[in-house]
Regions:
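Conserved glycine-rich Rossmann-like NAD(P)H-binding loop of the short-chain dehydrogenase/reductase
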Residues: 20-36
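Canonical Rossmann dinucleotide-binding motif of NAD(H)/NADP(H)-dependent dehydrogenases/reductases
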Residues: 1-25
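Active-site helix of classical SDR
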Residues: 120, 156
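The beta1-alpha1 cofactor-binding region of Rossmann-like NAD(H)/NADP(H)-dependent oxidoreductases
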Residues: 31-32, 52-64, 102
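Conserved mid-core segment of classical short-chain dehydrogenase/reductases
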Residues: 62, 85-106, 129, 149-152
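Catalytic Tyr-X3-Lys loop
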Residues: 76, 84, 98-118, 132, ...
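Alpha-helical segment proximal to the catalytic Tyr-Lys
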Residues: 125, 169-173
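Residue(s) in the substrate-gating loop at a strand-loop-helix junction
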Residues: 140
Length: 179
C-alpha cells in the first residue's frame, strides 16, 4: 500500500515495486493523477489497484484495509508518502511567523502528521494479526534542519520522524522483528 502514489515520489516508488513483481495498491486523494499513475504502472504488470482515498479518514482506511485483505489475503508493506506543503503555508521572504494564516498551519500539520499516523494505526492492526509486516514513513530533511519559510511542514515532518521511532519501538516490544 503506497499513500500519495499519484505524486512524483509515491509514483516512483510504486514503479520500483511493480518492476520487482509486487502487488501494489496505489492510494491518492487526487483522482486524475491517480488514474494516470495506475495506467503507467500497468505497463509493469497487472497487479496494481488505484484507490482514491483520504489518509485523514480512518473509516475509509479501515475499509481499504479490509478490501485489500479480502482480495489478496494480507498486507505486507505500508509506505506513508502522502503529504506536502500548500499555498499560504509558506511564509513570504518579508513575512513573519506571527503573520501566518493559522488555518494553513493546521492543514499542513494535519496532513503531514496525521496522514502518517492514521494509516499506521489502521494497517498496523492488520499486520499485528498477520504477525508481520513493514511500515515505512517518509519524512523530510525538514525534520532535521528547519527549512526557511515552511514552519508547519518542518514541524510536522519532525513529528513524523519522532513518531516513526516511537512506533518502531512500540511494535518491536510487542511483535519482535515481525513488524
Amino acid at each position: 500500500v503506497i499513500t500519495g502514489a499519484g505524486g512524483v515520489l509515491g509514483g516512483s516508488i510504486a514503479k520500483c515495486f511493480m518492476q520487482q513483481g509486487a502487488k501494489v495498491v496505489a492510494v491518492d486523494i487526487r483522482q486524475e493523477q491517480l488514474d494516470k499513475r495506475v495506467e503507467e504502472l500497468k505497463t509493469y504488470g497487472e497487479d496494481v489497484i488505484g484507490i482514491v482515498g483520504n489518509v485523514l479518514d480512518i473509516a475509509s482506511l479501515e475499509k481499504l484495509a479490509d478490501d485489500i485483505v479480502a482480495k489478496w489475503g494480507r498486507i505486507d508493506i505500508l509506505l506513508n508518502i502522502a503529504g506536502g506543503n500548500m499555498p499560504g503555508a509558506t511564509l513570504a521572504p518579508d513575512q513573519h511567523f506571527y503573520d501566518m494564516d493559522i488555518s494553513c498551519w493546521e492543514k499542513v500539520t494535519n496532513l503531514n502528521m496525521n496522514g502518517t499516523v492514521y494509516p499506521s494505526l489502521v494497517f498496523s492492526k492488520v499486520m499485528a494479526k498477520q504477525g508481520k509486516g513493514c511500515i515505512v514513513n517518509v519524512s523530510s530533511m525538514a525534520a532535521y534542519s528547519a527549512i526557511t519559510r515552511v514552519p508547519g511542514y518542518s514541524a510536522a515532518k519532525t513529528a513524523v520522524a519522532n513518531f516513526t521511532q516511537w512506533l518502531a519501538s512500540e511494535l518491536a516490544l510487542k511483535y519482535g522483528d515481525g513488524i
